[in-house]
């Protein structure tokens, strides 16, 4: 905060926040823990530049080939799916719209989710806690439309049954090549405030806001480059061997950050681009700000309008505490819905009955995924359920400890030597074997130091919400409870057991059986 207030360009926190798009402000200025000598509360945690939004790109030549107006992008979802239908022709290697696949394909689904009026996560304004929130009817409507784009059954001109009008590809490189080769009619891509599509040929490619959904607006992702200073900076020696205090390192970091986010840096960038003959690729904002208005004639006004509308309607990616994995958790219900379609269990058709039943099924899938996300990603479990899980975890921990002690006791008994004459256990017999014990001391100390000490000190992670940076919190048996009630963990155990059985059966028993057969079978 003090750096912002002392900066000649910002001068105050309010002035700094006013310089940012409205959607970016809550990300950089929010509640946080006490760090770096600052009290817990609202602080500026980062400074951002290079604002990015996602917009809809379309190929004008493909639109024209499909009988669509090359200058008329889809304005709503009805037009979007109609355009995708008319463009899609797999026999000619043409696809209506590009959609991401893979383990985090829901990243591409977010635009549909937001445009339907739903959200992936929301924050409680009173408590500040984040919750998954995609188990709503609006989210089901978004998923239904997304599924239609990806799986709707239709026949191409050759009479072949096709599914969907999209690519659903997780390979970014192949998607990029398909864009360049003119195989994709529509796709979403980033627009930056520094170039704003300036590297795209406006005669071939159009840029528009994402089509409006049931909410009446088309909402896409807003992103930005955010720079912050590590709170745990400590003094250290530089490359010349001189000690540099932590405060001086922070000052140097801020000097770099403030310059990279300053008007001076933007001016240098604009001048350099113009001098290199790249003035046409600069955004209208930069061209006006630094007086290169002669290049504005090369820039379609609709592109700037698309950027501004996306900035107004868009939302930042989920940024709350523990929300980093939301795309993985949100992809799971999408995959479940896809599998239901493949299995023929998802009602098809546009009749009110089929659509209502389909939406009910999709919402049920999303609601289960929402509860799963809150429990596993956010860590929010109802107190009664948490108490039950903790009780089970304590019982299991006691059983494990008892079994461990029993096994160790029996191993100790087996390896404890007995006198061959009396049958009694022998003692340590230090007087007789002192030299042997002395020789063993270095080895024992080494084993204790490098094996058992790390194991004992590291085992405290079992009882902690461990943080690499910051304070780790003691959570008792909550970690064990989380594992015991995790479907993924039990699935991993089952898969490990199956792999072991296959390995033993095929790799160990099969050769033995084969050898016996070869030996016993008469020739």
Predicted regions and their residues:
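Hinge/lid segment of periplasmic solute-binding proteins
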Residues: 1-55, 206-209
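Long, aromatic- and glycine/proline-rich binding clefts that accommodate carbohydrate-like moieties
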Residues: 29, 208, 270-339
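Transmembrane alpha-helix signature in integral membrane proteins
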Residues: 392-400, 487-517
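Conserved C-terminal helix/tail region of periplasmic/extracytoplasmic solute-binding proteins
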Residues: 305-406
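Extracytoplasmic/periplasmic substrate-recognition and gating elements
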Residues: 66, 130, 151-156, 198-284
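Short membrane-interfacial helix/loop motifs at transmembrane-helix boundaries
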Residues: 425-429, 447-487
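Extracytoplasmic/periplasmic solute-binding protein
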Residues: 27-49, 54, 78-132, 138, ...
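Glycine-centered hinge/linker elements that transmit conformational signals in sensory
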Residues: 81-86, 124-169
């Amino acid at each position: 905060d003090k750096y912002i207030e002392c900066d000649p360009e910002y001068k105050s926190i309010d002035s700094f926040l006013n310089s940012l798009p409205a959607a970016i402000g809550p990300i950089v200025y929010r509640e946080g823990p006490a760090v770096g000598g600052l009290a817990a509360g609202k602080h500026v945690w980062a400074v951002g530049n290079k604002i990015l939004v996602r917009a809809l790109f379309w190929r004008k030549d493909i639109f024209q080939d499909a009988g669509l107006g090359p200058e008329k992008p889809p304005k709503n979802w009805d037009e979007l799916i109609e355009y995708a239908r008319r463009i899609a022709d797999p026999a000619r290697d043409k696809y209506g719209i590009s959609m991401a696949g893979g383990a985090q394909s829901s990243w591409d689904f977010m635009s549909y989710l937001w445009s339907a009026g739903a959200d992936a996560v929301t924050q409680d304004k009173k408590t500040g806690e984040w919750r998954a929130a995609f188990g709503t009817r609006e989210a089901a409507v978004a998923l239904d439309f997304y599924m239609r784009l990806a799986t709707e059954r239709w026949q191409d001109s050759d009479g072949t049954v096709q599914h969907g009008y999209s690519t659903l590809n997780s390979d970014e490189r192949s998607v990029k090549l398909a864009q360049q080769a003119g195989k994709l009619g529509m796709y979403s891509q980033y627009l930056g405030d520094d170039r704003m599509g300036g590297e795209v040929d406006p005669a071939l490619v159009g840029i528009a806001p994402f089509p409006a959904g049931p909410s009446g607006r088309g909402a896409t992702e807003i992103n930005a480059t955010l720079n912050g200073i590590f709170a745990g900076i400590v003094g250290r020696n530089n490359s010349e061997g001189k000690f540099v205090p932590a405060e001086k390192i922070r000052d140097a970091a801020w000097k770099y950050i403030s310059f990279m986010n300053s008007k001076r840096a933007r001016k240098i960038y604009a001048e350099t681009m113009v001098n290199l003959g790249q003035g046409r690729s600069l955004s209208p904002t930069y061209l006006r700000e630094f007086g290169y208005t002669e290049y504005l004639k090369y820039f379609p006004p609709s592109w700037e309008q698309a950027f501004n509308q996306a900035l107004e309607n868009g939302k930042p990616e989920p940024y709350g505490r523990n929300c980093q994995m939301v795309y993985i958790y949100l992809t799971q219900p999408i995959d479940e819905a896809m599998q239901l379609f493949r299995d023929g269990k998802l009602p098809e058709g546009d009749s009110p009955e089929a659509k209502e039943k389909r939406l009910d099924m999709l919402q049920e899938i999303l609601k289960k995924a929402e509860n799963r996300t809150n429990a596993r990603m956010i860590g929010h479990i109802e107190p009664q359920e948490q108490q039950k899980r903790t009780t089970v975890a304590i019982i299991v921990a006691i059983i494990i400890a008892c079994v461990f002690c029993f096994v160790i006791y029996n191993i100790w008994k087996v390896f404890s030597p007995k006198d061959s004459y009396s049958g009694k256990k022998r003692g340590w017999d230090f007087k007789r074997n002192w030299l042997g014990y002395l020789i063993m001391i270095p080895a024992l100390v080494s084993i204790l130091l490098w094996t058992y000490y790390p194991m004992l000190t590291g085992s405290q992670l079992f009882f902690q919400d461990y943080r690499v940076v910051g304070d780790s919190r003691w959570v008792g048996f909550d970690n064990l409870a989380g594992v015991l009630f995790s479907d993924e963990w039990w699935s991993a155990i089952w898969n490990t057991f199956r792999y072991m059985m296959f390995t033993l059966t095929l790799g160990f028993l099969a050769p033995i059986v084969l050898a016996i057969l070869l030996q016993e079978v008469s020739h």
